[in-house]
């Protein structure tokens, strides 16, 4: 009886389930950057604290060093300045 119920439910809802599954897979998981990447970005941040605006060259170098893409580098600096920078 359980098997019949399971088959009936699968038949009825398999379309919905596969749509949901693909939707979940599309949503990127939000997470922290890798620890070594964060520490490389923090090193740059700490040595440039008075003016923490990396040039495009800096961003390319940081991307190469951390394995992050330039957009991630950019977003990290935007967030970091917004959360932790008090211009003097």
UniProtKB/Swiss-Prot annotation:
Q: What are the residue boundaries of the ELK domain, all occurrences included?
A: 4-24
List, alphabetically, the InterPro entries matched: ELK_dom (IPR005539), HD (IPR001356), Homeobox_CS (IPR017970), Homeodomain-like_sf (IPR009057), KN_HD (IPR008422), TALE_homeobox (IPR050224)
Q: Which UniProt keywords apply?
A: DNA-binding, Homeobox, Nucleus
GO molecular-function terms, A-Z: DNA binding; DNA-binding transcription factor activity, RNA polymerase II-specific
Predominant localisation class? nucleus
* Keyword Nucleus attached: yes
Q: Where in the cell is it found?
A: Nucleus
Q: Does the keyword DNA-binding apply?
A: yes
Listed SUPFAM superfamilies:
Homeodomain-like
Q: Which GO terms describe its cellular component?
A: nucleus
List the SMART domains hit by this protein, alphabetically. Answer: ELK, HOX
Q: Which Gene3D superfamilies match?
A: Homeodomain-like
Q: Which residues bind DNA?
A: 25-88
State the similarity comment: Belongs to the TALE/KNOX homeobox family.
Q: According to its UniProt entry, what is the function of this protein?
A: Probably binds to the DNA sequence 5'-TGAC-3'.
What name is this protein filed under? Answer: Homeobox protein knotted-1-like 11
Q: Which organism is it from?
A: Zea mays
User: Could you read off the lineage of the organism from its UniProt record?
Assistant: Eukaryota, Viridiplantae, Streptophyta, Embryophyta, Tracheophyta
